Every structure is written in C-alpha cells, then in structure tokens.
Amino acid sequence: MRVIVFVKATEDSEKGTMPSSELLEAMGRYNEELIKAGIMLGGDGLQPSIYAKRVAFSGSDRSVIDGPFAETKELVSGYWIWDVRDMDEAVEWVKRCPNPMPGPSDIEIRPLYEASDFA
C-alpha cells in the first residue's frame, strides 16, 4: 500500500528556521534506510507558507491567495511517499524517524487511493 507521510509545520519551520546540521545528517541517514528498505518513493521538505499560494475555487471563479496562511490550523513542512505492506509498517518506520523539529512535532500517515479503489 502507498502512504503519504506528512511532517507537520511548527512555528519555527514557518519562520524559516533551518534544521541543525546534526538533524540534517540524521534525516539523511534515515532517508538512506528508507531507500535501502525499498519503501521510499519520494519526499521533500517544503519552504514556509509565506512563499506559497493557494487557488480558491468557487464555481467557475478562481482567486489566488498569497501566503502565509496564519488562519490555517495545521500546515505541512515536509512529506514522504512510501510503499509499505500495511499501516502498521508505516507506523513502525515513523517511530524510527528522528524528531524532525527542534521541539515537539507531529507526523501524520495517510493511505493514498489506488486505481482499484475506484473500480
């Protein structure tokens, strides 16, 4: 099953505070483990929402909203896409992840739809 793994943004990540060199090295080693295990399909870190844009749809109208998105309760600062046996395997891999932020943080795992889900 394929899953997307979201690293939730924090106040620091939204300020553009870069991870320490130690954390970058630890995350690099972790990503190498994911690749060697054959589960990592992709992933990246995201820049703060101040650099983002949203396109709002209302019928045939479109409007562009510039970041930052202070009113949004939860933002994403990074993601992976993994191919795992099941959700339990994904949870076990997340538990092995270095804390992606200097302080408290959350990582969310969500299954992706497959073509067979729409058959």
Spans of features found by a protein language model:
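Conserved, structured core segments of small domains
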Residues: 1-119
